[in-house]
Amino acid sequence: MGGISITQLLIIVAIVVLLFGTKKLRTLGSDLGESVKGFKKAMADDNKEKDAEFKSLSDDSETTAKTEKAKDKEQA
């Protein structure tokens, strides 16, 4: 109905190849791949930083809790 058929898609791909050339498209594809790889790496690095920060905060809270328990025992 309103969708793109296979033949229309092939015609569009052929026109794009004729306009830009295969070398330019290959370069564009590799640049796009490197961009995606860099984005994924940045996301992974961000998650590692957040995990380290969370661990640091949880260690601090455990230390504070132990200190408060010790103070409560001394007061009792």
Swiss-Prot record:
Belongs to the TatA/E family. GO terms for molecular function: protein transmembrane transporter activity. It comes from the Bacteria. Part of the twin-arginine translocation (Tat) system that transports large folded proteins containing a characteristic twin-arginine motif in their signal peptide across membranes. TatA could form the protein-conducting channel of the Tat system. Gene3D superfamilies: 1.20.5.3310. The keyword Mitochondrion does not apply. Residues 45-76 are annotated as: Disordered. This is Sec-independent protein translocase protein TatA. The Tat system comprises two distinct complexes: a TatABC complex, containing multiple copies of TatA, TatB and TatC subunits, and a separate TatA complex, containing only TatA subunits. Substrates initially bind to the TatABC complex, which probably triggers association of the separate TatA complex to form the active translocon. The gene is tatA. Pfam families: TatA_B_E. The chain crosses the membrane at residues 1-21. GO terms for cellular component: TAT protein transport complex. It is found in: Cell inner membrane.
